[in-house]
Design a protein with these regions (language model features):
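Flexible loop/coil segments at beta-strand boundaries within sensory signal-transduction domains
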Residues: 219-224, 307-311, 563-570, 667-671, ...
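An acidic, low-aromatic, low-complexity terminal/linker signal
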Residues: 690-887
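Extracellular/periplasmic juxtamembrane segments that couple receptor/chemosensory ectodomains to their
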Residues: 2-74, 275-426, 630-706
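Solvent-exposed, extracytoplasmic
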Residues: 138-152, 183, 228-287, 323-350, ...
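Extracytoplasmic/periplasmic ligand-binding sensor regions of membrane-associated signaling proteins
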Residues: 142-233, 238, 286-300, 488-496, ...
Length: 887
């Protein structure tokens, strides 16, 4: 532990606690109250009132340290979680993107047109002939490169190199390179891997900055190298997109990608954190305080989790925020709009709140209960004091102690509320963030699908074989099938690839399990749209619906027309449809977005869903919400504008859940304003928070404090009487103070077989057993009460001075009531059965709390303990009420 301004803080907080404004505000308030407690403790010892506040003062001091520590830890955890999430997603989203690029280079290097051009150039160079004769061929290849980049817009250049590094063709005409000496060429020709991936400066790049290049050899069918193909990734463009999605306006967090040595290779704010700067990484633990540019930052560094075994180029995500701003804007105030019952239920959740956290309000309640009892007992003792001056001072002291206790409790309640809201708001932020992650993964994934179908539709062999169907149907189908199988082997996100002719009849499939579809018309509306394209950028997507091409299951089919290259008029000879393997792919996306604990385990009960604007489920990790069902959630969650998010608490299946939602916005050109395809999908992430209370169940809570005017006996005409009040349920009851010994904690009660139900048992009081009564069944209470909620025993003098105990939920005040406001019950109704002896009329000028019922110890004994009945006369003098002890 480390001491900071008089408070023992956890060592992990010592470097950051001074920057936590809520902790500092509560610390200052509680320490000022602690000084008051010190004075009151001293006055209590000097007053002779018998009220020693030392234990209460020490308990409040200990709880202050516990509470401030937990508040500090939760505020820190929330800030760290936000940084961790951003750093992790920054690197993981990039790695997912690059995983797709590793497939691109391998597939494009097998392109027949590129292979043919490379062969032609090799032969010309081998013969020493002028390559200018291949200008037309080169232009066609460069046009093919342009078509590729129009679809896969993540690339800024494509370069085809000879085995000697000579540039054979390239997309970017402004790039002056004609011959490369980059060792990348030799590595691509010799590597046993499926690709070469480099991030560094290269003579292949027009700019002097480092760039990301994917390369692989182009070979003959027998594996003889012909050339090297390079795809140049738009690294800066992509990192800007990633950082923009993770940032918010006026967010002071700086995001970066670091290389294996800790150098900054991309920054969300290059003026703040420049590219190339060395950065101190946080490699041990979730967070640390790092120094950069003479300033301290709260920071985290996260290695990638990889994707399908691919771990990327060895980069790490890094997030940091100036430490003086790291804990600002915690966002807990947004929970104020939630109904109190919702928050009360949520705060009980053992999944969200550890035993240590849930014990803090219990400790505060126990301390306040002990304080109330101490003040209550002090007032009871003062009622029998024979020294008026001392009594007057002691009463003022007790009143001040009670008031200070209330102020302290108020601060504790507010700080505990802040603590709880910090935990819940952190969960809400997490669900919102994870929903954004899920929909971003989906949009990026489906962007690739829209690209794939259009690019594969340009495969010249597919058009040629469709043209041969009439003359050699079996050979043509076999050739198309081989192409589809080769593609599907590389791209496992598809369950099936299908080629159909101009009439919409299936010609070939990649998955033999769908062989029965061959020769049959697809018969789905997307086929008609597919066969009427506007240009080579056109593609169509089916509705998310069951299809025979996916064995009757729901999926999306992406399709593009195959141009009839022999027609010469821009017509189509068929189309290609790629059947997305929706069930496992969407489930995996959602699984990756589920919240996890510190051990990496999915939080129990959490789940995630993709759904359309009509609330229909597209995918779910929870079997309770299968595909096609409608989610019973507010429409507002599905009315979000594209690219916006929300987080709230909502009841679902008898449980309150934190619900984070985000509406899709597409990725790059996909689903953009210029794209003909629009399909809004929401991602929703759910975390259970606590059970919804049963109908009519009222969350447990203490009755409100009742305050009556404190009158001097000499100041009220006819005198006054002190009444020791308490609550059974929410019923306000009392007994004349002179008949009360004290209140004690309701523990150590032993049940005794054979006694009536209203006798709860016995407990030891001053070394002798006393009976304890439960009066709830004899009071005609307005609503049922929880017997488990009894917290105090009021010890009352019975007949013959034999005491007994009454179970109560909470102690009230001991008001000094004017006798003119006290009426005997027997004046209202003649009965010997009532336990009540008097009623106190409310003082409408000072309070509106209703009637106080004063119970009679003698009647309780007579009715419930088998004693003889000796009812007081209706005209019983109030003097006797105040001063006569039952004999």
């Amino acid at each position: 532990m480390s001491i900071y301004k008089g408070i023992d803080f956890d060592d992990t907080l010592s470097a950051v606690v001074r920057h936590m404004d809520p902790v500092q505000d509560y610390r200052e308030t509680l320490q000022s109250l602690q000084a008051v407690w010190d004075n009151l403790t001293l006055l209590g010892q000097l007053s002779g009132s018998g009220t020693d506040m030392s234990e209460t003062r020490q308990a409040f001091a200990a709880l202050t340290a516990d509470l401030l520590n937990r508040l500090g830890i939760e505020i820190r955890n929330k800030a760290v979680q936000a940084l961790k999430s951003k750093a992790q997603v920054a690197v993981d989203i990039m790695v997912r993107n690059l995983f797709e690029r590793t497939a691109d280079i391998g597939f494009l290097a097998q392109d027949d047109d590129i292979r043919g051009f490379a062969r032609c150039m090799r032969d010309l160079l081998a013969r020493g002939e002028d390559t200018q004769c291949c200008t037309g061929h080169r232009q066609r290849i460069e046009q093919r490169f342009r078509e590729y980049v129009r679809k896969y817009s993540v690339y800024h250049d494509i370069i085809l190199l000879g085995t000697d590094g000579r540039v054979l063709a390239q997309l970017d005409a402004s790039n002056p390179v004609r011959q490369s000496a980059d060792p990348l060429v030799r590595e691509a020709l010799e590597t046993p891997e499926a690709y070469v991936e480099v991030f560094r400066r290269s003579d292949l790049l027009a700019e002097p900055r480092p760039g990301l290049i994917y390369a692989y050899r182009v070979t003959e069918e027998d594996g003889t190298p012909l050339a090297v193909l390079c795809l140049c990734f738009r690294f800066e463009n992509e990192t800007r997109r990633i950082f923009a999605n993770l940032g918010k306006p006026r967010d002071r967090t700086v995001l970066a990608l670091l290389d294996a040595d800790g150098g900054v290779i991309a920054s969300s704010d290059p003026y703040h954190l420049p590219v190339g700067a060395p950065m101190e990484r946080v490699l041990e633990g979730d967070w640390g305080v790092v120094l950069f540019g003479g300033r301290e930052y709260l920071a985290t560094t996260r290695p990638t989790q990889g994707y399908q075994g691919y771990m990327g180029p060895g980069w790490m995500g890094h997030a940091m925020v100036p430490i003086e701003h790291a804990f600002a804007h915690q966002g807990a105030d947004r929970l104020a709009a939630l109904p109190a019952g919702v928050m009360a239920a949520v705060m009980k959740s053992p999944t969200l709140f550890s035993e240590e956290l849930r014990n803090i309000p219990r400790q505060a309640e126990q301390i306040q209960r002990a304080l109330n009892r101490s003040v209550w007992n002090g007032n009871v003792r003062q009622s029998s004091s024979e020294v008026p001056a001392n009594t007057s001072f002691s009463k003022v002291l007790l009143w001040e102690i009670g008031n200070t206790g209330l102020k302290t409790t108020d601060v504790f309640e507010r700080s505990i509320g802040n603590l709880n809201e910090t935990v819940v708001s952190s969960i809400l932020d997490d669900t919102r963030f994870l929903a954004s992650l899920a929909i971003d993964i989906m949009d990026r994934n489906l962007y690739e699908r829209a690209n794939d179908c259009r690019w594969w539709a340009l495969n010249a062999s597919l058009a040629r074989q469709l043209g041969r169907l009439a003359e050699a149907p079996d050979e043509a189908r076999a050739a198309i099938t081989r192409v589809l199988e080769a593609i599907n082997a590389l791209y496992t996100v598809y369950d099936n690839l299908v080629v159909f002719d101009a009439a919409g009849t299936v010609v070939a499939v990649s998955n033999p399990h769908y062989g029965e579809c061959i020769g049959h018309a697809v018969g789905e509306e997307w086929v008609r749209r597919c066969l009427a394209p506007a240009d080579t950028q056109s593609y169509v997507v089916s509705a998310f619906a069951p299809t025979p091409l996916y064995h009757g299951r729901h999926t999306y089919i992406y399709a593009a027309a195959i141009a009839d290259t022999d027609a010469g008029h821009g017509g189509t000879c068929g189309g290609i449809g790629i059947v997305f393997d929706a069930e496992p792919q969407f489930r995996a996306m959602l699984q990756d977005a589920l919240p996890r604990n510190a051990r990496g385990e999915i939080m129990p009960g959490s789940f995630a869903v993709f759904a359309d604007r009509g609330r229909r489920v597209i995918a779910s990790t929870d079997a309770r919400y299968p595909i096609g069902t409608e989610l019973p959630l507010p429409e507002a969650l599905f009315q979000l504008a594209n690219g916006t998010d929300s987080a709230t608490i909502h009841a679902l299946d008898g449980c309150y859940h934190a619900v984070g939602a985000r509406m899709s916005a597409g990725y790059r050109e996909f689903k953009s304003a210029d794209d003909a395809y629009h399909n809004d999908v929401a991602a929703l992430v759910f975390v259970p928070l606590g059970a919804v209370p049963a109908a009519g169940e009222v969350p447990a809570g203490e009755p409100g404090l009742v305050r009556l005017p404190r009158l001097r006996q000499t100041g009220a005409p006819g005198g006054s009487t002190e009444i020791a009040t308490f609550f059974i349920g929410d019923e306000w009851l009392g007994i004349v103070s002179a008949h009360v010994l004290e209140a004690v904690d309701a523990t150590g009660i032993t049940s005794v077989p054979g006694l009536p139900d209203h006798v709860q048992g016995v407990f030891m009081y001053q070394d002798r057993p006393l009976l304890v009564l439960d009066l709830k069944a004899h009071l005609r209470l307005r609503r049922p009460v929880d017997a488990a909620g009894y917290r105090q025993i009021v010890v009352v003098r019975g007949r013959g001075k034999e005491p007994f105990g009454i179970l109560v939920h909470r102690l009230g005040e001991i008001p000094e009531v004017a006798n003119s406001r006290i009426d005997p019950v027997n004046l209202l109704y003649q009965s010997e059965a009532a336990l009540a002896e008097h009623v106190v009329r409310p003082d409408t000028a000072n309070d509106g709390h209703g009637i106080l019922i004063v119970l009679s110890p003698e009647r309780i004994v007579a009715r419930l303990l088998g004693g003889s009945t000796a009812l007081a006369e209706p005209a019983l003098a109030l003097r006797a009420l105040a001063g006569v002890v039952l004999e």
